[in-house]
Amino acid sequence: DSVVRNDQAFSLFSSFTLGYYREAMIVLWALLVENKHFSSAVVNSPMFSVLFADILFFVFQGKQNGTLASVVHLCGVILLLLSESEDFACALNKKSPQTLPFDLTGVIPGTSTLTDVLILLMSSLFCEVTEYDPLLEMFLIVLSNSSSGLQGLSFTSASKLIALIGRLSRSKFLVQSPRNSFLLTVALDIIDNVLQSSLANNPSFVYVALENEKLFRRIAEMTPRSILDSAVAIPRPKDGYEPEPAPQLPPFATEQWYQKLLSSMCVKHIVDIIQALLKETQSICQGEAEDQDRLMDFLKSVEYPSEIPLVSHQMRKYEHGLQSAQWVVA
């Protein structure tokens, strides 16, 4: 009697309703945990794009309905487990189904890749990042785990991803919670992996990264003092009004903590790659209307700068435990 039902919980690509969709997803989660080879079978299935779209649909539904919080968490766990498969990135490079169970600005069904859909859904759910959210962390880790093999990212999804990094790098956000800096670190790992591994296969992504060189340079030039000063900046009082008391930083936001943050970010490596590519493009850009077309043609065949060493990033895996199991089935 306590089984959760939802009349909208069905696959739009078949006539079979999934009245017990939560139970079906728990079975999938259990199989992925118990059988490490099962994830490869799932991501290599010809129906993977349909399954992936349905999982994102449940996330989309759950974020709008507080009673489905456990379903949202379950979807995140399933995606994390799937992202540990070596073939997951290749699966994300596939085109999305011709019909999607939700509408997202920037997504073209049948043309956008599954990675584009994932990034644009993440962007729509977290268009204003004001506090730490475990779902955002799951999305970022899923992308980070697969980022070295991603190809064909669209201009729109690349722009949204880098815009998210801009929001995650705000000083006030970083000092809000000790976990927030981890979100920025993982997001930067995504950018670095794509730039290192798939330059020629992601011309739109590289183009957007070059356009945002100032953002990455600003993050790279952050110092403990500048972050702290920016986070507690006091606006000038208006005439006739007393200045507001200076906000207090949380206890964790020490200079030592920020030194650890700055050392964990790969942003300086990103800046080195971008600046090397910008030097190569100087002869292409001549201040003419055709510059963008010439630049895109160049980026389709660009090679990684040989003078910049490669940097490896860790695979972040899901850790199964009693607390997670209780949360999922709650």
What are these model-derived regions, one by one?
Residues 53-56, 63-330:
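Eukaryotic scaffolding regions of large macromolecular assemblies
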Residues 1-70:
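Alpha-solenoid helical-repeat scaffolds
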